UniProtKB/Swiss-Prot annotation:
Source organism of this protein record: Vesicomyosocius okutanii subsp. Calyptogena okutanii (strain HA)
Positions that bind [2Fe-2S] cluster: C328
SUPFAM superfamilies the UniProt entry points to: PLP-dependent transferases (SSF53383)
ATP-binding in keyword set: no
Localisation: Cytoplasm
Pfam families: Aminotran_5
NCBIfam families attached to this UniProt entry: IscS (TIGR02006), PRK14012.1 (NF010611)
Protein's UniProt name: Cysteine desulfurase IscS
Biological processes, Gene Ontology terms: [2Fe-2S] cluster assembly
Keywords: 2Fe-2S, Cytoplasm, Iron, Iron-sulfur, Metal-binding, Pyridoxal phosphate, Transferase
């Protein structure tokens, strides 16, 4: 069996070799295996220094104070901690939360849990390009709104929300603003010293770091209070208890440091590859690019091939590892809720493929993907009676199908 070409970088990234080498130094008896909370001896001091350095590295990439970085097990936990933490701490101020229908499941399901606890959540529709209309957000704000949670970059369609304007609007109305930045760190410049953002979630494995590691930015000035969701030894200033995984933290810090040094050059290369991929598909019939192409990260191309089932196409192009939806929900055969929120019908949503490219993608891999996808789409359409009807000029949306 040949190993498929990896083009699913939004699902996860391989750990960078430089990151892995740093992590290994904090695992074995010959390295620095200490507990950073052991402040009475050398091993603990060394681990604590490593954790402090990593905290600084993460803060440097996003232009924040290292004291504002709270370690977590990943962006899912960070989103839970941010949203539940604010809701529970400030529930006497209000019980209304606003979010977007295209958010990651870890935001949407957290909001649904809060609804079961008596909170009210407004789920906003995006525009057809995936972006949020600020007027819609403004109209949804109320006296009892305590939190707005909007992701920076969408995991399926790669669009970049205007978090600067959203944050300003939130702060004008004394509302806390949380941003899920799992898909934007290392791809989009972030300066939290200039943005009106109160909480921001990060994931290491989306940026060539280890899985099971994340962070939450919690603004200190003006101070944001959150109620802990995990209790124990009072680690992370009482916000997230649990022994710190030094090797994981070091890995995340190194991944963020590499991103800070190489992001601009890497984005240029990845954008060129993404554009090459787009050019390879755009002249095909009945091809639709999902999401805004201007306000978008360089490595994402979500594209629908009409009259082809996405699942069938993925099986046909199994020499390329791609996705037809979020990694957390792609086991379902339901059409993507993100694409449905953009207004796509079931057929077009089902025919979508998400190509995401990254640090190790090559021009040869792009060309291979273009040739393979074009050939398989043509073959699958040749087998489709719907394609024949379309080619004969039949408006399939107006066909009344009889049940058998």
């Amino acid at each position: 069996m040949s190993i498929p070409t990896y083009m699913d970088y939004s699902a996860t990234t391989p750990v960078d070799e430089r990151v892995a080498q740093k992590m290994i130094q904090f695992l074995t008896k010959d390295g620095n295996f200490g507990n950073s909370a052991s402040n009475s001896h050398y091993y603990g001091w060394q681990a604590d220094e490593a954790v402090k350095k990593a905290r600084q590295q993460v803060a440097n990439l996003i232009d924040a104070d290292p004291k504002e970085i709270v370690w977590t097990s990943g962006a899912t936990e960070s989103n839970n901690l941010a949203i539940k933490g604010v809701a529970h701490f400030y529930h006497k101020k209000g019980k209304h939360i606003i979010t977007l229908k295209t958010e990651h499941k870890s935001v949407l399901d957290t909001c649904r849990q809060l609804e079961r606890e008596g909170f009210e959540v407004t789920y906003l529709d995006p525009m057809s390009n995936g972006l949020l209309d600020l007027n819609i957000l403004r109209d949804a704000m109320r006296e009892d709104t305590i939190l707005v949670s909007i992701m920076h970059v969408n995991n399926e369609i790669g669009v970049i929300q205007d978090i600067e304007s959203i944050g300003n609007l939130c702060h004008q109305n004394n509302i806390f603003f949380h941003v899920d930045a799992a898909q934007s760190a290392g791809k989009v410049a972030i300066s939290l010293s200039e943005l009106s953002v109160d909480l921001m979630s990060f994931s290491a494995h989306k940026i060539y770091g280890p899985k099971g590691m994340g962070a939450l930015y919690v603004r200190r000035k003006p101070r944001v209070r959150i109620e802990a969701q995990m209790h124990g030894g009072g680690h992370e200033r009482g916000m997230r208890s649990g022994t710190l995984a030094t090797h994981q933290i070091v890995g995340m810090g190194e991944a963020f440091a590499i991103a800070q040094a190489e992001m601009r050059e890497e984005n240029t290369k990845i954008r060129q590859l993404r554009d090459r991929l787009l050019v390879g598909f755009i002249d095909m019939e009945e091809v639709v690019v999902n999401g805004d192409m201007e306000s978008r990260i360089p490595g994402n191309l979500n594209i629908s091939f009409n009259y082809v089932e996405g699942e069938s196409l993925m099986m046909a192009i199994n020499d390329i590892a791609v996705s037809s939806g979020s990694a957390c929900t792609s086991l379902s055969l339901e059409p993507s809720y993100v694409l449905r929120a953009l207004g796509l019908n079931d057929e077009l949503a089902h025919s979508s493929i998400r190509f995401t490219i990254g640090r190790y993608t090559t021009e040869a891999q792009i060309d291979k993907a273009i040739d393979l996808v074009r050939a398989k789409v043509d073959k699958l359409r040749d087998l489709s009676p719907l394609w024949d009807m379309f080619k004969d000029g039949v408006d399939i949306s107006k066909v009344e199908w009889s049940a058998h």
